[in-house]
């Protein structure tokens, strides 16, 4: 698994493809995601060692101009973050849930990483801007106090860039909502 990830989110699909090529040529990194996201944006996610990720993201951000939505370099990513992006992390029993919604994928992934590093919660999912108007959201589960802490940490993280849409903690979710949130 990669020690670090880098994310570049752009308002142009063509520019995203161009920069993806430039970033991959600039450093020894792996392409994890290269995808269109709503509404007409483009997302690049790279993995590799921290120095290479920093170089690749610098290459991308320096050439993105006004098409840059957000970027992120995240070293020592928590082991639950990538599985939460590509699917779901399982939760054994119904618990409190917390949801944090952001305006960018990079802000949400950074918030999710900080939340699970600072709280005893399970990061259930990170839904990345596909079919939801370019927004991103994360879902955590655990004891109420831990979920409250995780949501606070994540909200503060997203709020640092002004990219927090909304946050919510549901102490005792209804069974139907629980299934929808944690089972997909």
Swiss-Prot record:
Coiled-coil annotated residue ranges, if any: none
Any GO BP: propanediol catabolic process
Disulphide connectivity of cysteines: none
Disruption phenotype: No visible effect on BMC morphology. Slight growth impairment on 1,2-propanediol and vitamin B12.
Localization per Swiss-Prot or TrEMBL: Bacterial microcompartment
Gene induction: BMC production is induced by growth on 1,2-PD vitamin B12 medium.
Family annotation (InterPro entries): BMC_dom (IPR000249), BMC_shell (IPR050575), CcmK-like_sf (IPR037233), CcmK/CsoS1_BMC (IPR044872), Micro_shell_prot_PduT (IPR011238)
Annotated BMC domain residues: 4-86, 96-182
GO molecular function, one term: metal ion binding
Cofactor detail note: Probably bound by a single Cys residue from each subunit; which protein provides the fourth ligand is unknown.
Annotated family: Belongs to the bacterial microcompartments protein family.
Protein name: Bacterial microcompartment shell protein PduT
Origin species: Salmonella typhimurium (strain LT2 / SGSC1412 / ATCC 700720)
């Amino acid at each position: 698994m990669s020690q670090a990830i880098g994310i570049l989110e752009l308002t142009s699909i063509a520019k995203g493809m161009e920069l993806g090529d430039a970033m991959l040529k600039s450093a020894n990194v792996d392409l994890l995601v290269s995808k269109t996201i709503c509404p007409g944006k483009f997302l690049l996610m790279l993995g590799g060692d921290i120095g290479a990720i920093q170089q690749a993201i610098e290459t991308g951000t320096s050439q993105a101009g006004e098409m840059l939505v957000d970027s992120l370099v995240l070293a020592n990513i928590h082991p639950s973050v990538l599985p939460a992006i590509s699917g779901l992390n399982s939760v054994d029993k119904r618990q409190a849930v917390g949801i944090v919604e952001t305006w960018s994928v990079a802000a949400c992934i950074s918030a999710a990483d900080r939340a699970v590093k600072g709280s005893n919660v399970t990061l259930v999912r990170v839904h990345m801007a596909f079919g939801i108007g370019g927004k991103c959201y994360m879902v955590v589960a655990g004891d109420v106090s831990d979920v409250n802490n995780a949501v606070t940490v994540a909200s503060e993280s997203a709020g640092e860039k002004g990219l927090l849409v909304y946050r919510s903690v549901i102490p005792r979710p209804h069974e139907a909502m629980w299934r929808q949130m944690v089972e997909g």
